[in-house]
């Protein structure tokens, strides 16, 4: 009985560790946003820095649209 309890507690602790790590990754993405390729970055994503951030509802104050044609969803904005 005691061994089953210990196994249950260890599995619960491992599950909580995984869930907290996934949550931290999601928070980092929310703060950073999804990078996109501005026109000033060059023609290809290979070897170029992605200096823009995709915003779904238009560029916020202090940012400008840095790509003439799309992404398909949202705007590629740069400070």
From Swiss-Prot:
Domain of life where this protein originates: Eukaryota
Stretch forming the signal peptide: 1-21
InterPro entries assigned to the protein according to its UniProt record, in alphabetical order: Myo_ane_neurotoxin_sf
Keyword vocabulary terms for this entry: Cleavage on pair of basic residues, Disulfide bond, Ion channel impairing toxin, Nematocyst, Neurotoxin, Secreted, Signal, Toxin, Voltage-gated sodium channel impairing toxin
Propeptide residue span(s): 22-30
Subcellular location per the Swiss-Prot or TrEMBL entry: Secreted; Nematocyst
Location (main, coarse): secreted
Transmembrane segments: none
Disulfide pairings: 36-76, 38-66, 59-77
GO molecular-function terms, A-Z: sodium channel regulator activity; toxin activity
GO cellular component, as recorded: extracellular region; nematocyst
Gene3D superfamilies the UniProt entry points to: Anthopleurin-A
Function field: Binds specifically to voltage-gated sodium channels (Nav) (site 3), thereby delaying their inactivation during signal transduction. Has a strong effect on crustaceans and insects and a weaker effect on mammals. It strongly inhibits D.melanogaster sodium channel (DmNav1). It weakly inhibits the brain sodium channel Nav1.2/SCN2A. It strongly affects the heart sodium channels (Nav1.5/SCN5A).
Similarity comment text for this entry: Belongs to the sea anemone sodium channel inhibitory toxin family. Type I subfamily.
Note: This protein is encoded by at least 3 different genes. At least 3 other genes code for a similar Av2 with an Ile (instead a Val) at position 34.
Full protein name: Delta-actitoxin-Avd1c 4
